[in-house]
């Protein structure tokens, strides 16, 4: 088992280094100009070249032209709207569905205030935020998968 040595903030040498701005990384290099002039352009150019290479090597396929006289049986939204679509589809009262959608960001806004007494960065030491995140992710995936299924089996995903 390893023991992590915590810095002694009463040490005058360490305090002098921190006062000079040398505490942001192990080597004591300042962010300007090292990171901003050399590392960031390399990362940006690398990202742009990867995106350009993918666009050239695997262009997007053009689908069949739209027919305004043929309506599909069920019109589905884009994939990122599947959980919201499923929520509105399964709740009988549409006002309740809209209120449930508004409750999601309202609930997420309350989590920092609930966890404000806890200063830890480790997610396992912040049980409320971790639990809210995990339950929200599972519910969003469940609703998203259910939106692609017929309405009668959409909540159970055909499992029960």
UniProtKB/Swiss-Prot annotation:
Report quaternary structure and partners: The 4 large subunits of the cytochrome b6-f complex are cytochrome b6, subunit IV (17 kDa polypeptide, petD), cytochrome f and the Rieske protein, while the 4 small subunits are petG, petL, petM and petN. The complex functions as a dimer.
Q: Which named protein is this?
A: Cytochrome b6-f complex subunit 4
Q: What does this protein do?
A: Component of the cytochrome b6-f complex, which mediates electron transfer between photosystem II (PSII) and photosystem I (PSI), cyclic electron flow around PSI, and state transitions.
Q: Which family does it belong to?
A: Belongs to the cytochrome b family. PetD subfamily.
GO biological process, alphabetically ordered: photosynthetic electron transport chain
What terms describe the molecular function in GO for this protein? electron transporter, transferring electrons within cytochrome b6/f complex of photosystem II activity; electron transporter, transferring electrons within the cyclic electron transport pathway of photosynthesis activity; oxidoreductase activity
Q: Which organism is it from?
A: Nephroselmis olivacea (Green alga)
Listed SUPFAM superfamilies: a domain/subunit of cytochrome bc1 complex (Ubiquinol-cytochrome c reductase)
The UniProt entry, under PANTHER family, shows: CYTOCHROME B
Provide the topology term for how it sits in the membrane.
Answer: Multi-pass membrane protein
Listed GO CC annotations: chloroplast thylakoid membrane
Q: Give the InterPro entries listed for this entry.
A: Cyt_b/b6_C, Cyt_b/b6_C_sf, Cyt_b6/f_cplx_suIV, Cytochrome_b_C_euk/bac
Q: Tell me where it resides.
A: Plastid, Chloroplast thylakoid membrane
Q: What NCBIfam families does its record include?
A: cytb6_f_IV
PROSITE patterns with a match to the protein in the record: CYTB_CTER
Q: Where are the transmembrane segments?
A: 36-56, 95-115, 131-151
Keywords carried by this UniProt record = Chloroplast, Electron transport, Membrane, Photosynthesis, Plastid, Thylakoid, Transmembrane, Transmembrane helix, Transport
Q: Gene name on record?
A: petD
């Amino acid at each position: 088992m390893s023991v992590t040595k915590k810095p002694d903030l009463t040490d005058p040498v360490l305090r002098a280094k921190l006062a000079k701005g040398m505490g942001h990384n192990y080597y004591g290099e300042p962010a300007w100009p090292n990171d901003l002039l050399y590392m960031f352009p390399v990362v940006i150019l690398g990202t742009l070249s990867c995106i350009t290479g993918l666009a050239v090597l695997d262009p997007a396929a053009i689908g069949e032209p739209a027919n305004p006289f043929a309506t599909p049986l069920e019109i589905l939204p884009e994939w990122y709207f599947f959980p919201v679509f499923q929520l509105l589809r399964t709740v009988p009262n549409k006002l309740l569905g809209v209120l449930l959608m508004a409750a999601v960001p309202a609930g997420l806004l309350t989590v920092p205030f609930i966890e404000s007494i806890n200063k830890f960065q480790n997610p396992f030491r912040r049980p409320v935020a971790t639990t809210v995140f995990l339950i929200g992710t599972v519910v969003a995936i469940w609703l998203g998968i259910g939106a692609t299924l017929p309405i009668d089996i959409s909540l159970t995903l055909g499992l029960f």
